[in-house]
Amino acid sequence: MQTLHVELGERRYPIFIGSQLDPEQLLEPYIHGQQVMIVSNVTVAPLYLSHYQEALESLGKTVATCILPDGEKYKDIQHLNLIFDALLEVGFNRDCTVLALGGGVIGDMAGFASACFQRGVYFVQVPTTLLSQVDSSVGGKTGINHPLGKNMLGAFQQPQVVLADMAQLNTLPERELSAGLAEVIKYALLGDEDFLVWLEENMDGLVARDADLLAEAVYRSCAHKARIVANDEKEQGERALLNLGHTFGHAIESYLGYGTWLHGEAVATGMVMAADLSQRLGWISNEDVARTKKIIQRANLPISCPQIPLDDFLGYMAHDKKVLNGQLRLVLLKQLGQAVITKDFDVELMKQAILANQHG
């Protein structure tokens, strides 16, 4: 087992990374009250819920559960209310812990519920997908979608602890595994060319679910994110770099309808668009773009999206949270392994990059 810490002063917390982790031993120091609400979904609960429920009950905790439908399209206010209903129906108080057992959607919703319930209760993350292990479970971003934009309602709510168990990735569908690899590739492109070289050498093993390689990828990804979050928790500066590919990707997700494409699939094509625009600006070479596309394709991810009317695409981009004083800012590549956030780009070149990476 490997351990990382997100350094946030008094709110410092560990990320435990390994296979067949022992929840009873690892969770005991981080469950502060007697009451635990496990939030999961209909896919994950039959696989792992009893394991965590029994571990918590053996610690003497009162455990209740809230099981939600599975999918991004349920990340809305109606389903968030089901978590509040469950907490209120069992009479949980301000010393309770909300434990997220699932992927990014469950983590986002359970975390947001924990931030809101009685103005804030304890929160624990047990991410069961690669994407949530390397990205959404670390750093405290929580929230739900609105019909006009992704993640428009939310809060920063740091967990007490994160348990990333590689054994849980064995039950992950191929498509979900690839979606997680998109976020792993993102860390390499935005800040670590050595990691990109490692991914190029080991992508076949990652796709084949080699547990040691997956643990290394999760560790290196979380280390990057932990460092950035420690420096910029509320995304006032450097943390925005973690949105490489996301402005384009969120537009794709929003237009196609949440859940049609997985988040990681949209981010993958978004990173291709960002690389394409970076090349058009003269920052990176054609070879760099080709290298970006190749590693994304080797992860079984899309490098273009279905045709989306340009006005619709730009409309969704205008709702992006990185818009500042009416100006869209994008995360682009100065070189592979070095991203910048900038408003200094030619909008016509951006339009060309969007259109060039769509298919009929």
UniProtKB/Swiss-Prot annotation:
It catalyses: 7-phospho-2-dehydro-3-deoxy-D-arabino-heptonate = 3-dehydroquinate + phosphate. One of its GO terms (biological process) is aromatic amino acid family biosynthetic process. Disulfide bonds: none annotated. Pfam families: DHQ_synthase (PF01761), DHQS_C (PF24621). It comes from the Bacteria. Its cofactor is Co(2+); Zn(2+); NAD(+). It is an enzyme of class 4 (lyase). Gene3D superfamilies: 3.40.50.1970, Dehydroquinate synthase-like - alpha domain. It is found in: Cytoplasm. Transmembrane segments: none annotated. Pathway: Metabolic intermediate biosynthesis; chorismate biosynthesis; chorismate from D-erythrose 4-phosphate and phosphoenolpyruvate: step 2/7. Zn(2+) binds at E183, H246, H263. Binds 1 divalent metal cation per subunit. Can use either Co(2+) or Zn(2+). Belongs to the sugar phosphate cyclases superfamily. Dehydroquinate synthase family. This is 3-dehydroquinate synthase. The gene is aroB.
